[in-house]
Structure formats: structure tokens, C-alpha cells
């Protein structure tokens, strides 16, 4: 495999672990998929995320109150280098009965820091 394909495989694995930990509501494992500080731009808000930013309570209120699980609908690599991969994604949030809460487009920049 090439450096580029290795980086893509590692980035996709990171996103798999990210989603699995999120769906398990395992905040500690979820945060292990991040490099800190992490930057999130969503809903016209810029957040600088540091370790401990995510709390178990986040699954009980707000946008996640009705949420049961999420799934990737699309993950397309739009740029890849040896230590950074940009992935155009779409994920869908579901309720326990399988009905859709919403689908969201996002670009993830996955970096290899350590």
C-alpha cells in the first residue's frame, strides 16, 4: 500500500470508531478519536473542543434528546496526504423506531498526530 492509501484507511477506521463510540454513548472512547484541540463549525457556531468537552448528558437534551443512533450515508475522500485526509460525509440520525431525525452533510479533516 502507498502512504496515501494507508492514510485513507486509517482515516476511515477513525471515522468508524468515532461513530461506534458515539452510538454507544461512550464519551471516553468518542473523545479518543479526536486530536485536540479540535475545531467544529456547525449551525453558524465555531467551537474549539478540548478534552472533556463532551459530557454524557449531551445525549439527554437538545438535538440528541430523541436520538437513538447515527449512520454514515456517504464518505468520499476529497483530499488525502500522508498525514491528513479530508472526507466529504453525510450522516443520518435515527430514532429508536428507525424514523429519521435528519441527515447532515459535513467535511471531516482527519489528521495523524501521533
Per-segment meaning from a language model:
Residues 1-36:
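Short, low-complexity N-terminal intrinsically disordered segments enriched in polar/charged residues
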Residues 27-83:
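A solvent-exposed, acidic/Ser-Thr-rich amphipathic alpha-helical stretch
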Residues 42, 95, 113:
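Acidic surface patches and DE-rich sequence motifs
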Residues 77, 93, 109-110:
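Hydrophobic beta-strand positions
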Residues 82-86, 107:
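Structural motif
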Residues 88-94:
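Generic short beta-strand segments
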Residues 101-114:
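Short beta-strand edge/turn micro-motifs at domain boundaries
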